[in-house]
Amino acid sequence: MTKRSEAKYKIDRRMGQNIWGRPKSPVNRREYGPGQHGQRRKGKLSDFGVQLRAKQKLKGYYANISERQFHGIYVEAGRLKGDTGENLIGILERRLDTVVFRAKFVSTMFAARQFINHGHIKVNGRKVNIASYQVKPGDVIEVKEASKQLAVVLEATQLAERDVPDYIEADHSKMTAKFIRIPALSDVPFAVQMEPHLIVEFYSR
């Protein structure tokens, strides 16, 4: 198992949930946290603990976004019209690394970030190597021609464990995807329940 995989599954173990729905997640085999003391029974979490856990889970899901970056996204969500929690999810789902993952161009959020950083992705015909780039409805995302036959791409398109959500139109024969609309929380195919309202409560303390 690579260091990247170890870090990814450590998030699962810490949360005690298979947050990406992966068949190889260690929490499919055990229900306790990482480390030698992970089997100890945990007490009931305080309201603060529940809110913090919700934040850590969502940050972890999106490839362990840094606290500084995540808080910036929260502030941006609060400036938009509508529900802050819904806006938070909308911004996260518009990230280029998220769209590349959702389109099944790569198999994990972590791989999506690396794939973009290495210059394998174009948006509307222009190379974009910033994982946090905000995609807009109507944008077309594509894998560069020279990258379409990479093993990481070919393997990801065959994954049976998840489907492309309906707010993205993906054509794997051309390795292109069109971002149709900004999704609501209920549209996003999370493998576990995400609770952005608890994150709003956390930052509103």
Curated annotation (Swiss-Prot):
Residues 18-46 are annotated as: Disordered. It comes from the Bacteria. Residues 94-154 form the S4 RNA-binding domain. One of its GO terms (cellular component) is small ribosomal subunit. Disulfide bonds: none annotated. GO terms for biological process: ribosomal small subunit biogenesis; translation. SMART domains: Ribosomal_S4, S4. The keyword Ribonucleoprotein applies. Keywords: Ribonucleoprotein, Ribosomal protein, RNA-binding, rRNA-binding. GO terms for molecular function: rRNA binding; structural constituent of ribosome. Coiled coil: none annotated. InterPro entries: Ribosomal_uS4, Ribosomal_uS4_bac-type, Ribosomal_uS4_CS, Ribosomal_uS4_N, S4_RNA-bd, S4_RNA-bd_sf. Part of the 30S ribosomal subunit. Contacts protein S5. The interaction surface between S4 and S5 is involved in control of translational fidelity. One of the primary rRNA binding proteins, it binds directly to 16S rRNA where it nucleates assembly of the body of the 30S subunit. With S5 and S12 plays an important role in translational accuracy. NCBIfam families: PRK05327.1, rpsD_bact. Belongs to the universal ribosomal protein uS4 family. This is Small ribosomal subunit protein uS4. It comes from Bradyrhizobium sp. (strain ORS 278).
